[in-house]
């Protein structure tokens, strides 16, 4: 037994012979276990060893899973020892009230196999309630004419305990005039009556103060007191008399409040005030259910009666006359049961979750039905409502099992509302429903699904490292870890070592972050393969592709390719004939931008001009043309400051300075050049070393070429091939394009032949007159070098050679009217004996053709060896061909296309230039 229970808590198995006989016919009849314990046992107290009483061994307990199934959790079973323990407070008065016998009945459930055992625990009363009076004081009026032996009913006390622990005795404080008698009602409750021992004399003493004590026989006994104030009144020698000492009446529990129960009557032989009778309840507790008319004695129902709560009422009435004398009677009210209680459905042993892969017939819950009515009004049947994958099986009397009846799928129905309806057999029958919600547990049977089949995101270059560039989302209809999705990068078209330095992804949110600033010029797009994986076991996953497009920003300023500084850092100049008409193409500013799109769309603007209005600049082409003819007052040397802006926001720009000289020949320019101061000795020395280095490289190159040609001719064994070899010197300079533009989007490349010297002496290169069309045009008599603007103390003057007629366009070859001059074949051009001036014009032509892309200059066979392999990203479809307007000092002819050279014809003016070169050598 548990603590405090003693032998009273000892298990008492009640073998009965007739149960044994019945068991022969009913083998499935369950055995009932009885225990007796006192109330108010502490939580955890042992009621008895339920496992032992049921015949279970300790080894069977883990598999049998013995537990208690009851409406309220008063008891629990220890999983280790099988002992029945008290789990909540046991208050007998709260559980059973004044019932003489109090017992709790419940079922003990054992699994494997499933069995039910009826357990009865009788709760014994302890003396835990003190008798209490309904009032702390009573006032009693007694006539002085009252005779000794007259009895007066006093207010009774109430004790919630039963048996010996309830109210047993009343005691009155010692008095010469009064004594006390204990009386008992028909229901067993006791009440006190005070007896007058000696006559009273109002003139001697008007009142008396007594103490009434109520005692029980508990251990230890408890008591309470009430004060009695006795007032002595004048004589009234006749007390009221009821027509009956006891009234009995039967009343249905469904009567409405206000219904008359009965009417009592009383008479008084006195007259006047002493004969005026008033009725009242002797106990205040009776006024909760009934009402009494104090004048007529009519008793009516005050509140609704309930057979299940109280089956019988015992009411004590008092009749008091005007003189203060009273009489009492008892009214016994029997309550008749009606079918006024609907059955109740109580679910027990409910699981938290039912896994969606549960098998058919899986036990889900235990439910009980209860009806407070008696006899056939309390017999109940129940059924399951709705179309649900469950069914109800009868387990025992008023006990049912809920089991699965179909396959469950949480994704279709994550929960079920189960409604069980119970109906009794009363007339009319009553029914009630009880609903519970069963939650279906998840199984990882769904893989994550991305919101899109693929993702494409645009990211502007120069983004801050760590910035969010995109977010992918995947959903998983599963719950808990089965539906928790994490993200990772599975693959990419980047190098594996570089992947972590480019992007990363948040495993929780799917946000993709840039780990570095992207550069559109280096990386324009890349693709990632992302994976979403749930946390189930085994885990399920899905992949999706994310393509990242790096958008361009205007982060590169334009770069001017032409005009460029000379090899010695000096500025170059362009010559314009004096006779240039308005619209004459002077030169072209060539610039590139490493950006793309509108960020690389360049425009050209004149910021400053020494003679405003003399030249015009193409907004998109960068072509510098004469806006009017040269005036007498115009300076020979002109300077233009040109700004090149891109189309970005904000736009970036670069500037270039053009030096233009109006002259028909180089002779006119040389005096102006000689006026300039000599460069410093350091620069002259540097130029000297550069010239020596170039000369050595050229000599080595020529020697290698001569040896290669000689070997080839010897192998061919053709003497005629040796006659084509002429001693000469061909030099090809390095590209003037900045190195960083070799990988840009819009770079240009030019091949220049420049005479480098620290002095003003001009050096010319000679080549054989019979050059093939595939050779560099610089291998002729003329030198095509651009002259840097530098000082020289020694200048050699040369006469201008006659025009080279082979450099003219035929009528069919002319580009049209885009130039400013007519371009007829007989047009007069200034003569020039220096072939280097022709090269300057060719560079201008190639610069213009870099944007055209369709010219024969800059790459084809028979061209001047100028490579226009770079062009702007935008194509000027209608850029005019200005080759016919390019001024070539020393020649009045326009440029000839490559077709003429492919015919193998040498220029007509070549001999003249060669002769001039010979004169220079002689000098």
Curated annotation (Swiss-Prot):
Protein localization: Cell membrane
Every Cadherin domain range: 31-133, 134-242, 243-345, 346-450, 451-560, 568-673
Keywords (A to Z) from UniProt: Calcium, Cell adhesion, Cell membrane, Glycoprotein, Membrane, Repeat, Signal, Transmembrane, Transmembrane helix
GO molecular function terms attached to this record: calcium ion binding
Membrane topology, as annotated: Single-pass type I membrane protein
Keyword Repeat: yes
GO cellular component, one term: plasma membrane
Lineage: superkingdom: Eukaryota
Position of the signal peptide: 1-30
One Pfam entry name: Cadherin_2
Gene Ontology annotations of biological process type: calcium-dependent cell-cell adhesion via plasma membrane cell adhesion molecules; cell adhesion; homophilic cell adhesion via plasma membrane adhesion molecules; nervous system development
Stored InterPro entries: Cadherin-like_dom (IPR002126), Cadherin-like_sf (IPR015919), Cadherin_C (IPR032455), Cadherin_CBD (IPR031904), Cadherin_CS (IPR020894), Cadherin_N (IPR013164), Protocadherin/Cadherin-CA (IPR050174)
Glycosylation sites: 417, 543
Cytoplasmic side: 711-923
Topological domain spans for side Extracellular: 31-689
Residues annotated as transmembrane: 690-710
Coiled-coil boundaries: none
SUPFAM superfamilies: Cadherin-like (SSF49313)
Stretches the record annotates as Disordered: 797-832, 893-923
Biased composition (Basic residues): 913-923
Function text: Potential calcium-dependent cell-adhesion protein. May be involved in the establishment and maintenance of specific neuronal connections in the brain.
PANTHER family: CADHERIN-87A, PROTOCADHERIN GAMMA-B4
Record's protein name: Protocadherin gamma-B4
Species the sequence originates in: Homo sapiens (Human)
Gene: PCDHGB4
């Amino acid at each position: 037994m548990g603590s405090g229970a003693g032998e009273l808590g000892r298990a008492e198995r009640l073998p009965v012979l007739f149960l044994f006989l019945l068991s022969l016919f009913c083998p499935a009849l369950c055995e009932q276990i009885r225990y007796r314990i006192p109330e108010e046992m502490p939580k955890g107290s042992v009621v008895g060893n339920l496992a032992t009483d049921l015949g279970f061994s300790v080894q069977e307990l883990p598999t049998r899973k013995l537990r208690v199934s009851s409406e309220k959790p008063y008891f629990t079973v220890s999983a280790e020892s099988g002992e029945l323990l008290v789990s909540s407070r046991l208050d007998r008065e709260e559980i059973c009230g004044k019932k003489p016998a109090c017992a709790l009945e419940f079922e003990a459930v054992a699994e494997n196999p499933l069995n039910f055992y009826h357990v009865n625990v009788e709760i014994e009363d302890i003396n835990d309630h003190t008798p209490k009076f309904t009032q702390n004081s009573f006032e009693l009026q007694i006539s002085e004419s009252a005779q000794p032996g007259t009895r007066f009913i006093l207010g009774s006390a109430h004790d919630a305990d039963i048996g010996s622990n309830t109210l047993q005795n009343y005691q009155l404080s010692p008095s010469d005039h009064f004594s006390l008698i204990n009386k008992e009602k028909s229901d067993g409750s006791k009440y006190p009556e005070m007896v007058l021992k000696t006559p009273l004399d109002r003139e001697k003493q008007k009142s008396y103060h007594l103490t009434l004590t109520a005692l029980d026989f508990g251990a230890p006994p408890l008591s309470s007191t009430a004060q009695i104030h006795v007032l002595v009144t004048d004589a009234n020698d006749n007390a009221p008399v009821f027509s009956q000492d006891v009234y009995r009446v039967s009343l249905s529990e469904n009567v409405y409040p206000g219904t008359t129960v009965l009417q009592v009557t009383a008479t008084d032989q006195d007259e006047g005030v002493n004969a005026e009778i008033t009725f009242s309840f002797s106990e205040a507790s009776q006024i909760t259910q009934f009402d009494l008319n104090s004048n007529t004695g009519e008793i009516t129902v005050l509140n609704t009666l309930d057979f299940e709560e109280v089956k019988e009422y015992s009411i004590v009435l008092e009749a008091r006359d005007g003189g203060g004398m009273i009489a009492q009677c008892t009214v016994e009210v029997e309550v008749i049961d009606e079918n006024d209680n609907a059955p109740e459905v109580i679910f027990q042993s409910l699981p938290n979750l039912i896994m969606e892969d549960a098998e058919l017939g899986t036990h889900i819950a235990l439910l009980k039905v209860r009806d407070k009515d008696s006899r056939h009004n309390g017999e109940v049947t129940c059924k399951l409502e709705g179309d649900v994958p469950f069914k109800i099986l009868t387990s025992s009397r008023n006990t049912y099992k809920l089991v699965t009846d179909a396959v469950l799928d949480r994704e279709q129905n994550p929960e079920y509302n189960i409604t069980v309806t119970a109906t009794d057999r009363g007339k009319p029958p009553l029914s009630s429903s009880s609903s519970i919600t069963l939650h279906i547990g998840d199984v990882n049977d769904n893989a994550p699904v991305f919101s899109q089949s693929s993702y494409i995101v645009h990211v502007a270059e120069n983004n801050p490292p760590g910035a969010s560039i995109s977010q992918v989302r995947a959903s998983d209809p599963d719950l808990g870890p089965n539906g928790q999705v994490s993200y990772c990068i599975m693959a990419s078209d980047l190098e594996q070592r570089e992947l972590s330095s480019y992007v990363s992804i948040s495993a929780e949110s799917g946000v993709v972050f840039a780990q570095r600033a992207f550069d559109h010029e280096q990386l324009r797009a890349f693709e990632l393969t992302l994976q979403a994986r749930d946390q189930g076991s085994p885990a399920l996953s899905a992949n999706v592709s994310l393509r990242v497009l790096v958008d361009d920003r205007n982060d590169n300023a334009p770069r001017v390719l032409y005009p460029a500084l000379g090899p010695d850092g000096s500025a170059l100049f362009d010559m314009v004939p004096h006779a240039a008409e308005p619209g004459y193409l002077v030169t072209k500013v060539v610039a590139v931008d490493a950006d793309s799109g509108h960020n690389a769309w360049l425009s050209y603007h004149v910021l400053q001009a020494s003679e405003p209005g003399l030249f015009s600049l193409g907004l998109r082409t960068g072509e510098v043309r004469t806006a009017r003819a040269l005036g007498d007052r115009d300076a020979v040397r002109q300077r233009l400051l040109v700004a090149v802006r891109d189309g970005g926001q904000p736009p970036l720009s670069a500037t270039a300075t053009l030096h233009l000289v109006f002259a028909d020949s180089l002779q006119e320019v040389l005096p102006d050049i000689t006026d300039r101061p000599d460069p410093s000795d350091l620069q002259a020395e540097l130029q000297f070393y550069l010239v020596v280095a170039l000369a050595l490289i050229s000599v080595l190159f020529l020697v290698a070429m001569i040896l290669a040609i000689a070997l080839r001719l010897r192998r061919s064994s053709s003497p005629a091939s040796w006659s084509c070899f002429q001693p000469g010197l061909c030099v090809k300079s390095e590209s003037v394009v900045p190195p960083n533009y070799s990988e840009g989007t819009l770079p240009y490349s030019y091949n220049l032949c420049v005479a480098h010297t620290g002095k003003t002496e001009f050096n010319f290169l000679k080549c054989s007159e019979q050059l093939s069309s595939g050779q560099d045009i610089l291998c002729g008599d003329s030198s095509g070098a651009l002259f840097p603007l530098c000082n020289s103390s020694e200048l050699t003057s040369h006469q201008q050679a006659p025009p080279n007629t082979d450099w003219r366009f035929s009528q069919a070859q002319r580009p049209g009217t885009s130039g400013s001059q007519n371009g007829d074949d007989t047009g007069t051009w200034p003569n020039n004996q220096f072939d280097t001036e022709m090269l300057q014009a060719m560079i201008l032509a190639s610069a213009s053709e870099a944007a055209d892309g369709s010219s024969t200059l800059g790459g084809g066979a028979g061209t001047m060896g100028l490579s226009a392999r770079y062009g702007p990203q935008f194509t000027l479809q209608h850029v005019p061909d200005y080759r016919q307007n390019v001024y070539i000092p020393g020649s009045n002819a326009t440029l000839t296309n490559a077709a003429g050279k492919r015919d193998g014809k040498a220029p007509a003016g070549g001999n003249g230039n060669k002769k001039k070169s010979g004169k220079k050598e002689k000098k």
